[in-house]
């Protein structure tokens, strides 16, 4: 079972306790040593699995995740991505949403340049309101979107950010 697929059930009965468990280590396992460590950055904003709002970038943002973050920041949203965006190296793999990434259930999902391929949308089935901004009017994401804008994300997103700033005074 993947995280975020089902609601968490209330605990019943007596509280559980944890006991330490000693595991013997073989000589071969003890000989293993760390040869390198690589730091990876994390997507900005709250954790994807816990975020109430998630702004996701897909192929249509063409690598411009600063654009995605520009909308996520005023909404205090997590930044996510499609597999294509991660495969292209535009954002770290920890931001990937879908079959081979995270499963999320935000109250608000905003997809920027996301086509809506099933390997991505399977990871957002628990989303409340889905907003799609994509220049392809035939993109499958519009079938599941509550609100959709057919347009170029590089033109639409700056207008949204400007309007958010105006509304917040």
Regions found by a protein language model. Give the residues of each.
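N-terminal glycine-rich FAD/FM-binding segment characteristic of electron-transfer flavoproteins
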Residues: 1-169
């Amino acid at each position: 079972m993947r995280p975020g697929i089902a609601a968490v059930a209330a605990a019943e009965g007596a509280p559980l306790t944890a006991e330490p468990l000693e595991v013997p280590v073989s000589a071969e396992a003890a000989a293993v040593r760390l040869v390198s460590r690589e730091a990876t950055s994390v997507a900005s904003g709250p954790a994807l699995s816990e975020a109430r709002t998630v702004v996701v970038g897909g192929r249509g943002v063409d690598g411009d995740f600063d654009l995605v973050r520009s909308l996520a920041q005023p909404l205090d949203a997590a930044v996510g991505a499609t597999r294509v965006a991660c495969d292209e190296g535009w954002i770290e793999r920890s931001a990937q949403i879908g079959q081979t990434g995270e499963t999320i259930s935000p109250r608000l999902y905003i997809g920027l340049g996301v086509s809506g391929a099933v390997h991505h949308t399977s990871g957002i089935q628990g989303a409340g309101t889905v907003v799609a901004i994509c220049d392809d009017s035939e993109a499958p994401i519009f079938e599941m979107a509550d609100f959709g804008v057919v347009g170029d994300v590089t033109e639409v997103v700056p207008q949204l950010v400007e309007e958010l700033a105006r509304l917040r005074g």
